[in-house]
Amino acid sequence: MNRIVLIGNGFDLAHGLKTSYKNFIDWYWKDWGEKLLHGLNKTETDGLCSFKIKDNVEVLNWASVFQGWYYRRENPLIPWNVNDVIHLVKENKDLCDYWISPFLQQICKSIETKKWVDIENEYYDLLSKCALKGNTETTVEVLNQQLHTLQEKLVQYLSLVNKTDTKICESIWDKIYSPINPKEISVEKFFQLKEYIDWCMKQDNSYWASKMQRYKEEFDSDYVDNYKKNCHKIYYVNYPRPFMLPDHIMLLSFNYTKTVHLYHNQNFFLNYIHGELNKPQNIIFGYGDEIDENYQALKNLNDNGCLCNLKTIKYLETDNYRNALAFMDSAPYQVCIMGHSCGNSDRTLLNTLFEHKNCLSIKPYYYIKEDGTDNYLDIIQNISRNFTDMKLMRDRVVNKSYCEPLISM
C-alpha cells in the first residue's frame, strides 16, 4: 500500500511563509508604490493597471511628484510609505487617470469582501464570461496576457519568499511517514487490506528489515514473528508497524516553493506537479476544471486562446503528470491532504486521484482557526465537488474522528 500526500498552499502558510494570493496582491501594490516613487515616465503601466499623470499637471515624471514638485511635506527626508503612495494616487483624481483591468479589479474585490481570493478561479470565471456570454469588458487575448503578467509577478514574489529560512515541523514529518490506520480505509476497499495482510504474512524478515531501513528505523523481528504466530488472536488494528507503513510515498506538491524539500526522504518520491521556481518555464498557472459545464462550451469554440491556460494541456509539457498517474496505477494508495483546499482550479486532477480504482481513502488534515473552530467541513465540501459519485465520496473520505490538525495551536 502506498500514500500520496497532497501539498497545498496551507502547507507553506503552516511554516510561517506569506504565500497566500492576498499576500501576493499586497506585495503587488507595494511594488507599484516603489515604481511610482522612482518612475521616470508620466504614464506607468503593466497591462493590469496604469497610472497616467494628467496633462495639466506640470511635473516631469512620477518621481518628481514625490520629490516635492507636487506633494510637499514638512520633512522631505522621511521616506515615503509605499502604501501611502498608492492610496494617495488612487484617490487623487486631479493628479492622474487611474485605470484597473476588470481581471485585477475582480481579484481585489474578492480580497476586500472575502479576505481571500483564488486567482485561477477568477481567471476562469472572466474567461467564461468573455468567451461565452458576450462580456465586452476585455478579450480572451488580453485576459491571457494579463494572466501571464500575474504569473511572472507571482514567480517574482514567491522567489523572494522562497529565501526565507524554514524549519522542519517534527509533527508534520511524523504524519507524512506514519503507518496507515486500518480504520481509515474505505469499506469498499477493505478486501484489499485483507489481501495485502495475507501477502505480508508470506514475506520474510529480510523484506521488512529493508523496508524499515528506507524509513531509517530499526526493525523488530520479534514483534513481527510474534504477530505471525498469534494473528488469529489479535484484533485487526494491531497489525505490525512494518506492515502498515506505506511501501512508497509520493509528495505531490502543488506549490512552487522549496518548503516541501524539508520533508523529502530520498527513498521516496517528490513531484512538483505545477513546476518549481527554479524552472519558471515549467510553471503551470491556469484552470483545471474539465467537469464544469462551461469547459465543453469553451472547447467547442475552436479558439485555442480559450484552452492555452488549461492545466491538462500544460501537464503535457513535463513528465510530472505521467509520473503521478503511474504512481496511482502501481498499487492501492491513501491520499493525505496537507494544506490543499481541493478547490475547483485543480478539479480534473483531483477527480482522477479521488475516484481512481486504487484510492483506498482520503484523509484531510485541517486547520484550527484563532477562534477555536476549524476548516474540516470546508475541505470536505470542496472534496465533494471533485467527485461525480457521491456514494464513493462518503465511503472514501476519512471521518473527522480519525483526522487531526496539520499543526496544533
Where are these regions (language model features)?
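Sparse, context-dependent recognition of short Cys/His-centered cofactor- or disulfide-binding micro-motifs
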Residues: 2, 9, 236-237, 245, ...
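SIR2/sirtuin-family catalytic core signature
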Residues: 1-15, 21-24, 39-49, 323-409
